[in-house]
Amino acid sequence: MGRRSGGRKLPFFASNASTSSSTKRTRSARRLPSLTRPRASSSPSPASPSPPPPSASHPAPPSPPLAVSPAGAGKVGKKKAGARLWMRLDRWGVSETLHLDKGSIIRRAGLPPRDLRILGPVFSDSSSILAREKAMVINLEFIRAIVTADEILLLDPLTIDVIPFVEQLTHHLPLKNLVCGNGQPGGDDHGEKHDDSPGDQVPRLNEATGAEHELPFEFQVLELALETVCSSFDVNVSGLERRATPVLEELTKNVSTRNLDRVRTLKSDLTRLLAHVQKVRDEIEHLLDDNEDMAHLYLTRKQLQNQQVEALISSAASNSIVPGGTSLSRLNNSFRRSVSIATSMHLDNDVEDLEMLLEAYFMQLDGIRNRILSVREYIDDTEDYVNIQLDNQRNELIQLQLTLTIASFGIAVNTFIAGAFAMNIQSKLYSIDDGSFFWPFVGGTSSGCFMICIVLLWYARWKKLLGP
């Protein structure tokens, strides 16, 4: 059995087995140019076909540069320099986290580099909503994202403040009513059904702009972002209101350094929160004042325009009626004009939908701002009340000081009289030895000084320098 199994080797492999490993490498290296010789020297006559090469029946091994080694695989998975963590979520609910650098983001979303600086740490405290050709840049407090017509790229999705926004995105996506051409059979307003036409592969513009009650993908993301930011503001304002009530009541009862420091911290937090709310409110107000900016935020409409124009051009190019390139260019211009007219019919409605969305959150932010201002007014009223208390105490101290000054003046007059008679001068009063003059004199001077104090106090009350 061993002999038979050993004797079944093919002659080709038997000859290869007898050669060395270096001969194998040499033959395999020589075989590569031999594959191209018959093709280069093959004659056009079919009478003498060239025999196929020996290696034609066997698939050629892959080229060495395409083979990925384990070390190469580790380099591919390594994080690039300057890359940041992003989460990608499309309208169908498919999400993934990946590290992307600025160049990848610029190529993916078609944004200029200056827009990515807005999402950097330098402008982290600013609030802005920018509309570009293919994307919308959202920088609202802790939410920094790039939204296109089909997906959202969220920066730093694992932070504590951004996690509620991620949960809302995953809860609301995928969209309930996706406007796609291949999802439902197409039909126009006259009941005609389109079969096997390129226009069926593209969403219809009237369905995406006017007929759908559901907002486009980018507006839904914007709504969730504004809702998350407003909810965060609401929670912070509620916390400040709960903190403010006991602190201010304690301050009215006891004006101490500790209570004043607590009120100072509360007031600084309130001022900082008011600044953040005011920034978001001003950005929404800026968008509401400019209808053109709101129209540029409609990314789905732009995408549908481009897709419809491309579909109509491709269908016209495949039509045999079109004779040449000149007619095709004219037809291209006519198609673009027709699409622009169709989109302008729905432009006001789209802007109205976005305007209603922004006005709702503008009113909510305005209400949050009014709550902050009411708490601030409460703090100001408490400070005024404390200042009134301090002024009252200061007035009482001044009255006490005035009373003591008047009493000191009377005592000083009595002391002056006693000091004058204590001097070593000649007087007949010193010859009186029975003491009948001393006590009446002391009593008279003391009574006179007391009367002086009474007169001064009465004068101070008459001038309302002292309280009743």
Swiss-Prot record:
<feature type="compositionally biased region" description="Pro residues">
    <location>
        <begin position="46"/>
        <end position="67"/>
    </location>
</feature>
<comment type="function">
    <text>Putative magnesium transporter.</text>
</comment>
<feature type="transmembrane region" description="Helical">
    <location>
        <begin position="402"/>
        <end position="422"/>
    </location>
</feature>
<keyword id="KW-0406">Ion transport</keyword>
<keyword id="KW-0812">Transmembrane</keyword>
<dbReference type="Pfam" id="PF22099">
    <property type="entry name" value="MRS2-like"/>
</dbReference>
<dbReference type="InterPro" id="IPR039204">
    <property type="entry name" value="MRS2-like"/>
</dbReference>
<dbReference type="GO" id="GO:0015095">
    <property type="term" value="F:magnesium ion transmembrane transporter activity"/>
</dbReference>
<feature type="compositionally biased region" description="Low complexity">
    <location>
        <begin position="14"/>
        <end position="23"/>
    </location>
</feature>
<protein>
    <recommendedName>
        <fullName>Putative magnesium transporter MRS2-G</fullName>
    </recommendedName>
</protein>
<feature type="region of interest" description="Disordered">
    <location>
        <begin position="1"/>
        <end position="76"/>
    </location>
</feature>
<keyword id="KW-0472">Membrane</keyword>
<keyword id="KW-0460">Magnesium</keyword>
<keyword id="KW-1133">Transmembrane helix</keyword>
<feature type="region of interest" description="Disordered">
    <location>
        <begin position="182"/>
        <end position="205"/>
    </location>
</feature>
<feature type="compositionally biased region" description="Low complexity">
    <location>
        <begin position="31"/>
        <end position="45"/>
    </location>
</feature>
<feature type="compositionally biased region" description="Basic and acidic residues">
    <location>
        <begin position="187"/>
        <end position="197"/>
    </location>
</feature>
<feature type="transmembrane region" description="Helical">
    <location>
        <begin position="437"/>
        <end position="457"/>
    </location>
</feature>
<comment type="similarity">
    <text>Belongs to the CorA metal ion transporter (MIT) (TC 1.A.35.5) family.</text>
</comment>
<keyword id="KW-0813">Transport</keyword>
<dbReference type="GO" id="GO:0016020">
    <property type="term" value="C:membrane"/>
</dbReference>
